[in-house]
Amino acid sequence: MGNLFMLWAALGICCAAFSASAWSVNNFLITGPKAYLTYTTSVALGAQSGIEECKFQFAWERWNCPENALQLSTHNRLRSATRETSFIHAISSAGVMYIITKNCSMGDFENCGCDGSNNGKTGGHGWIWGGCSDNVEFGERISKLFVDSLEKGKDARALMNLHNNRAGRLAVRATMKRTCKCHGISGSCSIQTCWLQLAEFREMGDYLKAKYDQALKIEMDKRQLRAGNSAEGHWVPAEAFLPSAEAELIFLEESPDYCTCNSSLGIYGTEGRECLQNSHNTSRWERRSCGRLCTECGLQVEERKTEVISSCNCKFQWCCTVKCDQCRHVVSKYYCARSPGSAQSLGKGSA
């Protein structure tokens, strides 16, 4: 039962707010082939890896992949079709494929191993395929069986979710690296043997975050949709999601600005959020987080000084311990706060 709970926790809770029954893991476990229970722990770890990467990628965004929002009720009216939804589906699907592929190459499953289908073939000038390529075909197949099988709808939102699931899996392939080993007399490297390996998961997260920033909004023909709502409609034409955009993230609805709290929609606003200011070793995007999270949402940046205790003046003593002093120093942290004695100014476009 522990593995089943992990899977439900990683996929069911994390994604319930975004696609209702589409992410009902219990439905899959009841109706899915029993053989797939072999992979439930890896699927759970993959989905959790996706959510953790989501939190990293959006740490300094107004929407920061919040736990509470992901545990929101699955009532249909709360199902969104925003670009944030698209990222959740893509990174979760990619995470499952990634971990399954890793475990396969490590020999954790009896029915799969390295992909040697191209071994011995010429790959390019001076190199041939060989070694142990990561078996992405297997990882993709299991990810698709688990994740896509949870999407029961036939409407525009369901097609959007399935598209973004696939875009996530394509991201795993797109970020793979070719690794080579030299062969030849005295290390001359006259020929190389090469194989494909998964990139670091962070690199794939960066890749999908760039896709999120450039996500495509799909304008549906409302005459072919029921109730005039693009996310709730049916009779969605197959050509609505163009094959030429198969690797892109797509969405149907514009996002709110996420400045203002709206708990019924799982939006918790930016009041109280930490931001970075004058920090070293940070990107320009991170350094601008105080403006994005606070100022642009009608909040002020509040400095709070905190005393931190850390080890210092450490010395090695024979044998064999390290002795350290406990040093105290004050650090400044910055948070979004309302101006004293005034009401919060609402960000435009709030939910």
Curated annotation (Swiss-Prot):
Cystine pairings recorded for this chain: C54-C65, C104-C112, C114-C132, C180-C194, C182-C189, C259-C297, C275-C290, C294-C336, C312-C327, C314-C324, C319-C320
Chief subcellular location: secreted
Keyword terms of this UniProt record: Developmental protein, Disulfide bond, Extracellular matrix, Glycoprotein, Lipoprotein, Secreted, Signal, Wnt signaling pathway
Tagged with keyword Transmembrane: no
Pfam families associated with the record: wnt (PF00110)
Residues with lipidation of kind O-palmitoleoyl serine: S186
PROSITE patterns: WNT1
Record PTM: Palmitoleoylation is required for efficient binding to frizzled receptors. Depalmitoleoylation leads to Wnt signaling pathway inhibition.
Gene3D superfamilies linked to this entry: 3.30.2460.20
TM region(s), chain numbering: none
A GO CC term assigned to this protein in UniProt: collagen-containing extracellular matrix
Signal sequence, renumbered to the chain: 1-24
Superkingdom as given in the UniProt entry: Eukaryota
Glycosylation sites: N103, N262, N281
GO biological process: anterior/posterior axis specification; canonical Wnt signaling pathway; cell fate commitment; dorsal/ventral axis specification; neural crest cell fate commitment; neuron differentiation; positive regulation of transcription by RNA polymerase II; response to retinoic acid
Subcellular localization, as worded in the UniProt entry: Secreted, Extracellular space, Extracellular matrix; Secreted
A single GO molecular function term of this UniProt record: cytokine activity
Keyword Transferase: no
Stated family: Belongs to the Wnt family.
Subunit relationships: Forms a soluble 1:1 complex with AFM; this prevents oligomerization and is required for prolonged biological activity. The complex with AFM may represent the physiological form in body fluids.
Function of the molecule: Ligand for members of the frizzled family of seven transmembrane receptors. Plays a role in embryonic patterning.
Protein name: Protein Wnt-8a
Lineage, top ranks: Eukaryota, Metazoa, Chordata, Craniata, Vertebrata
Gene this protein is translated from: WNT8A
